[in-house]
Amino acid sequence: MAEKILVGTSGWHYDHWKGPFYPQQARSDELLDFYTRRFSTVEINNSFYHLPSRKTFSAWRDATPPAFTFAVKASRYITHMKKLKDPEKALEKFFSCADGLGSKLGPILFQLPPRWKRNAERMRDFLAALPENHRYAFELRDPDWFHGEIFSLLEKHYCALCLFDFAGQKSPHRLTAEFAYIRLHGPSHQKYAGRYTKGQLRQWLRHAEKFIREGAEQVFIYFDNDQQGYAALNALEIQQMAGRTCSQANES
């Protein structure tokens, strides 16, 4: 049976997590194995800045357990530079690399710019250009995009509206696909910092459980408050709250 609530972090290769999460003396080539013994999913975040090669994606596929899932953040060239315009060539390049993950490729995240007002026509054309054999999530950083017209477009194309917590800004809870996607960037107004309290984690877990009740087949939760290793520590905590142990994470 597929895991209903999958918990992980945005990236795993952080030297400053040695001590708080990884063993202090862990080598760089040991980090992914350590991570996958505790979580069943990870969000590849560095692909936003630099797209890894297909060979690299394939190596990650081969180094992880059979049930492991990679979410991949799409290139900023698509979302920030081109602003979703004429995406065909950029999407082709992206998938020629990311498809190296094979069956372990999970949702693709498109994070839109924070100061770009709603453009429904651009979104409509972009959604129509997406290959149909993948799952997609959209993190809409400008609140102007929180509009019924956009939600309807996402629903029409079975794309998830990312529920996020970012520097005091939160997006609406709305299920627009058969899965849900949650990104937690930190509980404070300082980006990527701070540790969520147990009470705050329970609130976010309730969001995930609500998505399940609303019909979501799976909910992906990724922590991005990477300073001092808080992302990994919070991910472990909420995973335990959800009723999963480290040893169960990759047995589904």
Predicted regions mapped to residue ranges:
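Residues lining hydrophobic/aromatic ligand-binding pockets adjacent to catalytic sites
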Residues: 1-252
